[in-house]
Amino acid sequence: SMDHENEIIIYTHIGDNWMIESDANGWETYSELPRQRFEHQYFDDTNLIKNMVFDLQVPTIGAMPGPGFHWDSAMLCDVTICTEDTKIEVPHAQGGLVPGDGMGLMFQHYLGTKKGNYYMMTTRQVTAPQMLEWGLVSEVVPKGKAVERAWEIARMWKRMPYENRCIMSNLAKRPLMKLFMEDLKLHTVSEQYASLLRVAEGTLGDENSAQQDEKYISRVNDYRYATKDMEQPMNFELWDGMPKRAGEWFKKVESGEIENPYVFEHSNEPDWYNAF
């Protein structure tokens, strides 16, 4: 944001997907509780989201090349493009957590209160056609064309006077600015407080959770995005059996029976994964 030679920003991800390859060790850098978790969630997470809207004074285009989690950063751009295979979700509740890191707030904002609450609280996935119909994205394009389309739009905007396209971008960001001023901090603190309660109880990552102390989520995410299980209305059987099905699915991957399209080095899964 401080580099004034940046005139238009395309926000995307390397490869065919959107930030789907989890780092099994990624949480170790701030796993000390409670100070580092507080600093990460209360300061870093909140500011990362706010900076996308308040600090970037030039037009922004989110280009999603495929499915993945923490899609909220792409939705914070002035215009968002996704490919036809993209799907998104707010998975927190199924892992026993509160969805307060921005994704739940985005669902409420773009889908409306009732529909947003439903998809947030049941963890059901939203597909690309639904994302377009419900106003989460601006366009849906064929696989491999998201960045190409983003560049085309950027070249169009480049024809405008610099000052005018910056002012236009400010107007585009206004609804999210007002939303974040009212609710973002409350959402962030709510997830943080609920997580710390589970840590204090010793239940974060228990046998009823899809999430094992936050650094073991890689395999579960791969399963959720590689199958269509999460696209259908959730029932108790689907909800309760998801961790077990993820383990069974990955055993088939390891045996070569099926292919994991989201290959990543999963080195730190807990022992209970291997029991299925």
Residue ranges: model-predicted function:
Residues 104-114:
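Hydrophobic, secondary-structure "cap" segments at the distal end of domains
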Residues 81-82, 137-149:
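Short acidic-hydrophobic, aromatic-tinged amphipathic segments that line or gate anion-handling sites
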Residues 18-19, 24-52:
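Extended, non-globular alpha-helical segments
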Residues 11, 23, 59, 73-75, ...:
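Hydrophobic/aromatic residues within transmembrane alpha-helices
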Residues 2-5, 13-20, 25-26, 123, ...:
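C-terminal alpha-helix plus adjacent terminal tail
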Residues 51, 71-72, 105, 117, ...:
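Alpha-helical segments flanking ligand/cofactor-binding loops in enzyme cores
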Residues 47-95, 125:
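Glycine-rich beta-to-alpha active-site loop
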Residues 4-7, 77:
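Short, high-confidence coil segments that cap the C-terminus of an alpha-helix
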